[in-house]
Structure formats: structure tokens, C-alpha cells
Amino acid sequence: MEYQLTLNWPDFLERHWQKRPVVLKRGFSNFIDPLSPDELAGLAMESEIDSRLVSHQDGKWQVSHGPFESYDHLGESNWSLLVQAVNHWHEPTAALMRPFRALPDWRIDDLMISFSVPGGGVGPHLDQYDVFIIQGTGRRRWRVGEKLQMRQHCPHPDLLQVDPFEAIIDEELEPGDILYIPPGFPHEGYALENAMNYSVGFRAPNSRELISGFADYVLQRELGNTYYSDPDMPSRKHPADILPQERDKLRNMMLDLINEPAHFQQWLGEFLSQSRHELDIAPPEPPYQPDEIYDALKQGEVLVRLGGLRVLRIGDEVYANGEKIDSPHRPALEALASHIALTAENFGDALEDPSFLAMLAALVNSGYWFFEG
């Protein structure tokens, strides 16, 4: 299924992106859910998939984590089932992500899907990421407050909420409506009837994650073996002092590593192309031979990217799931990064190069791409 999003992206980016929340009425016209509540419940029974149940009964919040064996104990009100990264595991839902590729691939995170019975929700809370919440089957009331300093508390160890807030948006969403919420705006949503919601999340790394990730890269590759030296050490009155020039030299030793262009780019491509959630990787059995890849493409078969696989480009270099893809065929690499579905035409003359075919076969045999159908 192909979803058509009615949205003026330049206007949205100027007026709303990371600035103000907005309701996009009928953002998807004639919206059809890509999966059923029963299918979502089935996914939450799988151990590889991150899921949780949140309920609010008799004034108490409860959270339980999947995999779940049964839902028979749940009542008919005040609970929600939430499943992360469904686009990694259920191919039809991945189509719901594609209209949002007007935004950078490296910023997109995953598709979280929730099923809620009347009164179901997770309470008032803050997120530190951008999210587009698409209303599927059913109706849900959403309230969004102003971005202010708010006290957060935990009514349950696995649930962080904020105090009640005054709403700047108070809307009932119907199928195809979209609510965009930037980071830091408090919000809460409660189902008015059995309802499906699809949350397209966009995350940004914080400074701690960047420093930690780069430090891991340095350690793995045994970089930074230059030792501090001070042949021009000045005398000092107090032996406990670290002099300003010594402090600056130590800091510059660290910055020199980060500022080395080749290392930084290699790390950044690997770091940003890694998925935060597990992928549904299923290498083909038996593995493809390069000539089989060639024949299949030439016969018109379509090569499809695995749901949730991050394929990013920095300059001329392409990275997939934390690995650099090496090939001199730049247009073919660009096609791998730009297109979800690929045909022989996308690869051009690269298919005539045995080394490129071998590389492509390795990617397919890793489970990163597969032939449609």
C-alpha cells in the first residue's frame, strides 16, 4: 500500500518543525490501517520485539513488558498495548514511514504502534524527540501543553509523567489525522473507543551519546596512541597546580582525534547508521551467488531494503547498519542509499562489474536486502 501525505513540507519546516505542535486534519485521506489489533498483539508475543502494556485502574498505574502470553486478564477499559519498531517486523507498516522521507533518514527512529481500549493511555508526559502521531481506527482525544519547565514524577518505576497542564491543543483525532509534537511539549492522549495509533518518531543524539560512541570507536581501533609530552615544562611555585597551557594541551589531544576528518566521518557513518532496535534479519538459505543476483535483476525482479535498515550517505561514502559499503560505483551506491526498492536500472553498468555483484550478493546474503515476493 502507498500512503499519500497531504503536507506542505517547506511551510511545515518553517513554522512547526521543532517549534510548535500542530494538528494536521486528514493528513492521510481515506486512511487504512496497515495491520490489525490482533496482528499487533501477536507481535507483542515475540521475545525479539519491544512491547509493553500500560494500564490505569483504581487510581494506580501499572506497566508490564512483553513478550506476552495472553491478554485474557485485561478488561474493556483503561489499558494500552504499545509495540516499538513495528516497521522492522511487519513489512506493510514500513510503507507508513516513506511519506516522512522528506525529512533526513538519519533523524528517523522507528514506528511505534499502540492499541488502546476506551480510557487507555500512558498519562501526561514529555518526550525529547519529534513525533508524528497518526490516528488509525477509532478516535482519541489529545491534549498538548506549552513548552515550560515541568515537574516530572514516576507513578510507576517504568512510567515517567508530568503534572497536569493547561492545553494549547485539545483535539479529538479521527482516522488519517496527524498530531505533530516537537520535543519538550507535554502531552497526553486517551482513547475514546478502541483505537490504533501510529507514532513516527525522530530522535537526535545527545552530547553524551556522541562522546561515548566516539570513545568506543577510538578504543576498538586502538587510535589515540600519542602520549602527552612536555619538553618545555616551566617551573612552578605550587606542585599541585595544573597550568592553563597544560590543561589546554590535554584538551587539544582529545580534540585532535575528533577533528581528524577521516576518523570522524568513518565513525559518524557507522554510528548514525546503526539501528537502536533489533532488525528482522533473515539471511537467505541457500545464499545467493553473484550470478543469481544478476539474473534476477535482469529478469525484472525488485530488490527491497529490509524494514528499519538505516542506509546513509556522507559525501561519497555509504553506510548500512554500522558498516561502510565499499565500491567505486558511486551512482549505484547512491541508489542503495536513496531507494527502498531497486531494479536493474537503478544499478546501471555496475551490474557488469563482478566485484560490485559480489558486494551486492554479500549484502543480500546478510539479510539487508531481499527480493520482493
Task: Locate the predicted segments by residue.
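Short coil/turn segments at secondary-structure boundaries
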Residues: 55-56, 265-269, 348
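Acidic, low-complexity/disordered tracts enriched in E/D and polar residues
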Residues: 259-337, 361, 373
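Active-site region of the double-stranded beta-helix
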Residues: 1-16, 28-177, 185-228, 232
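Short polybasic amphipathic segments
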Residues: 51-55, 142, 315-321, 371
